[in-house]
C-alpha cells in the first residue's frame, strides 16, 4: 500500500520534489519538497485507494472507533469518504472557533462517550492534529489517534505526537516516497542525498550545499 500511494502522489504532483529549486514554507524553512494532498480530490481512483487504506488502518489499529473526525479543511473530504465506508458518524474540527452563531470549533454531533479517530492529509510538525485533538478532548471525547495520507517523518512532529498521547499511522511516508522517486527516475542520486539530508535537520540550510 505504501508504494502504491506514493506513486499516486507523485503521479498527480500532490507531492513535488525540487531539491535544486527549493520551496519556502510559511515558517520560512527552505524545503526540497512540497505537499498538496488536496489534489487527490480530483482523482476518483486515487481518493478511493486512500479511503480503502484509511479504512484498513482504522479497522486494524482503532477497531473501537465510534466517530471519524476530519481536520479543516484538507481532512474533511477524506473523513467523509472513510466514515461512509465504516458506517460511522463524522465531525470536523476547525483550527479555531467560529466568531459568530454558536461559535463552534467542532461541527457535527459528538458526545463524551465517543471514541474518535482524526483524519489528516499531512503530518509535518503535528501542530494541527494536536490542536484538533485538544478540542475534541475538551469536548469530552476519547481521542484514539490519527491517520494521515503522508508524513515527512520529522523528529519534531513525532516527538510532539507522542507527548500528546496521539498514536499515528500513515498510508505512505518520506522514505517510501524517495525510494519510488529514485526508481522511477524522478530524481537523481545527488538530489536524493539532498532530500535525505534535509530531513535530518529541516531548519538548517546545509542540505542545499550537498
From Swiss-Prot:
Keyword Glycosyltransferase annotated: yes
InterPro entries recorded: OPRT (IPR023031), Or_phspho_trans_dom (IPR004467), PRibTrfase_dom (IPR000836), PRTase-like (IPR029057)
Pathway where this protein functions: Pyrimidine metabolism; UMP biosynthesis via de novo pathway; UMP from orotate: step 1/2
Cofactor(s) demanded: Mg(2+)
Keywords in alphabetical order: Glycosyltransferase, Magnesium, Pyrimidine biosynthesis, Transferase
Reaction it catalyzes: orotidine 5'-phosphate + diphosphate = orotate + 5-phospho-alpha-D-ribose 1-diphosphate
EC category: transferase
Positions of orotate binding: 124
A Pfam family hit: Pribosyltran
Gene Ontology BP annotations: 'de novo' UMP biosynthetic process; pyrimidine nucleobase biosynthetic process
Sequence positions that bind 5-phospho-alpha-D-ribose 1-diphosphate: 94, 98, 100, 120-128
Gene Ontology molecular function: magnesium ion binding; orotate phosphoribosyltransferase activity
EC number: 2.4.2.10
Quaternary data: Homodimer.
Function noted in UniProt: Catalyzes the transfer of a ribosyl phosphate group from 5-phosphoribose 1-diphosphate to orotate, leading to the formation of orotidine monophosphate (OMP).
Family the entry assigns: Belongs to the purine/pyrimidine phosphoribosyltransferase family. PyrE subfamily.
Name under which the protein is recorded: Orotate phosphoribosyltransferase
Species annotation: Halalkalibacterium halodurans (strain ATCC BAA-125 / DSM 18197 / FERM 7344 / JCM 9153 / C-125)
